[in-house]
Amino acid sequence: MARQVEILGEMFAFVDFGETSFFDLPCVYLMAHEQADQIHIHYAGQTARLKARYAGHHQLAAAKSLGATHALILVAPDARDRREFETLLRWHFRPPLNLEEVPTHMQAWRAAMHCGKHDVALRAKAAHLGQAQPVQASVFTQSRIVRG
Protein backbone atom coordinates (compact mmCIF):
# COMPACT_ATOMS: atom_id res chain seq x y z
CA MET A 1 0.00 0.00 0.00
CA ALA A 2 1.24 3.51 -0.80
CA ARG A 3 1.86 6.05 1.92
CA GLN A 4 -1.20 7.98 2.96
CA VAL A 5 -2.09 10.86 5.25
CA GLU A 6 -5.43 11.78 6.77
CA ILE A 7 -6.62 15.26 5.86
CA LEU A 8 -10.05 16.49 6.97
CA GLY A 9 -11.09 12.91 7.63
CA GLU A 10 -10.08 11.54 4.21
CA MET A 11 -7.05 9.46 3.25
CA PHE A 12 -4.84 11.17 0.65
CA ALA A 13 -2.17 9.15 -1.18
CA PHE A 14 1.37 10.47 -1.71
CA VAL A 15 2.26 10.58 -5.42
CA ASP A 16 5.66 11.81 -6.62
CA PHE A 17 5.29 14.58 -9.22
CA GLY A 18 7.03 12.34 -11.77
CA GLU A 19 4.36 9.68 -11.29
CA THR A 20 1.28 11.89 -11.74
CA SER A 21 1.31 11.05 -15.46
CA PHE A 22 0.25 7.51 -14.55
CA PHE A 23 -2.93 8.64 -12.78
CA ASP A 24 -5.72 9.39 -15.24
CA LEU A 25 -8.19 9.83 -12.39
CA PRO A 26 -10.64 12.46 -11.18
CA CYS A 27 -9.33 13.77 -7.88
CA VAL A 28 -8.72 16.52 -5.38
CA TYR A 29 -5.00 17.19 -5.00
CA LEU A 30 -2.48 19.16 -2.97
CA MET A 31 1.03 20.15 -4.03
CA ALA A 32 3.19 19.54 -0.98
CA HIS A 33 6.47 18.55 0.57
CA GLU A 34 7.58 16.98 3.82
CA GLN A 35 10.05 18.50 6.24
CA ALA A 36 10.83 16.68 9.47
CA ASP A 37 7.40 15.60 10.75
CA GLN A 38 5.44 18.30 8.93
CA ILE A 39 3.71 18.52 5.58
CA HIS A 40 3.80 21.88 3.81
CA ILE A 41 0.83 22.56 1.51
CA HIS A 42 1.52 24.94 -1.38
CA TYR A 43 -1.52 24.54 -3.62
CA ALA A 44 -4.96 22.87 -3.55
CA GLY A 45 -6.91 21.93 -6.65
CA GLN A 46 -9.25 19.46 -8.30
CA THR A 47 -9.38 17.90 -11.72
CA ALA A 48 -11.28 15.39 -13.81
CA ARG A 49 -7.92 13.92 -15.00
CA LEU A 50 -4.82 14.26 -12.83
CA LYS A 51 -2.53 13.15 -15.66
CA ALA A 52 -3.70 15.95 -17.95
CA ARG A 53 -3.82 18.60 -15.23
CA TYR A 54 -0.26 18.13 -13.99
CA ALA A 55 1.22 18.01 -17.50
CA GLY A 56 1.11 21.81 -17.76
CA HIS A 57 -0.05 23.04 -14.37
CA HIS A 58 0.31 26.82 -14.02
CA GLN A 59 1.63 26.57 -10.43
CA LEU A 60 3.84 23.49 -10.66
CA ALA A 61 7.11 25.41 -11.15
CA ALA A 62 6.23 27.81 -8.33
CA ALA A 63 5.35 24.91 -6.02
CA LYS A 64 8.64 23.18 -6.82
CA SER A 65 10.53 26.39 -6.09
CA LEU A 66 8.92 26.36 -2.63
CA GLY A 67 10.10 22.78 -2.13
CA ALA A 68 7.07 20.78 -3.29
CA THR A 69 8.00 17.26 -4.34
CA HIS A 70 4.72 15.37 -4.55
CA ALA A 71 0.98 15.49 -4.88
CA LEU A 72 -1.39 14.30 -2.20
CA ILE A 73 -4.41 12.90 -4.03
CA LEU A 74 -7.92 11.86 -3.09
CA VAL A 75 -9.88 10.14 -5.87
CA ALA A 76 -13.30 11.79 -6.21
CA PRO A 77 -15.37 10.82 -9.29
CA ASP A 78 -18.16 13.40 -8.80
CA ALA A 79 -17.37 16.92 -10.06
CA ARG A 80 -19.39 18.71 -7.38
CA ASP A 81 -17.76 16.65 -4.63
CA ARG A 82 -14.34 17.65 -5.99
CA ARG A 83 -15.21 21.34 -6.14
CA GLU A 84 -16.67 21.37 -2.63
CA PHE A 85 -13.74 19.47 -1.11
CA GLU A 86 -11.28 21.80 -2.84
CA THR A 87 -13.19 24.71 -1.27
CA LEU A 88 -12.72 23.11 2.15
CA LEU A 89 -9.00 22.60 1.56
CA ARG A 90 -8.49 26.20 0.41
CA TRP A 91 -10.41 27.50 3.44
CA HIS A 92 -8.68 25.19 5.91
CA PHE A 93 -5.06 25.51 4.70
CA ARG A 94 -5.05 28.80 2.74
CA PRO A 95 -2.31 27.52 0.38
CA PRO A 96 -0.01 30.36 -0.69
CA LEU A 97 -0.09 29.54 -4.42
CA ASN A 98 -3.88 29.52 -4.79
CA LEU A 99 -4.61 32.85 -6.45
CA GLU A 100 -8.36 32.81 -5.79
CA GLU A 101 -9.67 34.51 -2.69
CA VAL A 102 -9.86 32.32 0.37
CA PRO A 103 -13.42 30.96 0.58
CA THR A 104 -15.66 32.73 3.07
CA HIS A 105 -16.64 30.97 6.26
CA MET A 106 -20.14 30.41 4.88
CA GLN A 107 -18.78 28.98 1.61
CA ALA A 108 -16.71 26.61 3.74
CA TRP A 109 -19.80 25.76 5.82
CA ARG A 110 -21.82 24.90 2.68
CA ALA A 111 -18.94 22.83 1.26
CA ALA A 112 -18.47 21.01 4.56
CA MET A 113 -22.18 20.20 4.80
CA HIS A 114 -22.15 18.87 1.23
CA CYS A 115 -19.13 16.67 2.04
CA GLY A 116 -20.56 15.43 5.34
CA LYS A 117 -17.81 17.12 7.36
CA HIS A 118 -19.94 18.36 10.25
CA ASP A 119 -16.99 19.17 12.52
CA VAL A 120 -15.54 21.45 9.83
CA ALA A 121 -18.98 22.97 9.22
CA LEU A 122 -19.25 23.82 12.92
CA ARG A 123 -15.83 25.52 12.87
CA ALA A 124 -16.78 27.51 9.79
CA LYS A 125 -20.10 28.57 11.31
CA ALA A 126 -18.41 29.58 14.57
CA ALA A 127 -15.86 31.61 12.61
CA HIS A 128 -18.67 33.30 10.68
CA LEU A 129 -20.32 34.25 13.96
CA GLY A 130 -17.03 35.59 15.29
CA GLN A 131 -16.66 32.82 17.87
CA ALA A 132 -13.40 31.32 16.65
CA GLN A 133 -10.36 31.94 14.50
CA PRO A 134 -10.26 29.17 11.85
CA VAL A 135 -6.88 30.07 10.40
CA GLN A 136 -4.90 26.91 9.85
CA ALA A 137 -1.33 27.23 8.68
CA SER A 138 -0.45 25.60 5.38
CA VAL A 139 1.86 23.36 7.43
CA PHE A 140 0.66 20.53 9.63
CA THR A 141 2.18 17.73 11.63
CA GLN A 142 1.56 14.35 10.04
CA SER A 143 0.35 12.57 13.13
CA ARG A 144 -1.85 10.15 11.21
CA ILE A 145 0.43 8.87 8.48
CA VAL A 146 -0.25 5.38 7.20
CA ARG A 147 2.90 3.85 5.75
CA GLY A 148 2.69 0.87 3.51
Feature-to-residue mapping (PLM):
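Boundary/linker segments flanking structured domains
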Residues: 1-42, 46-148
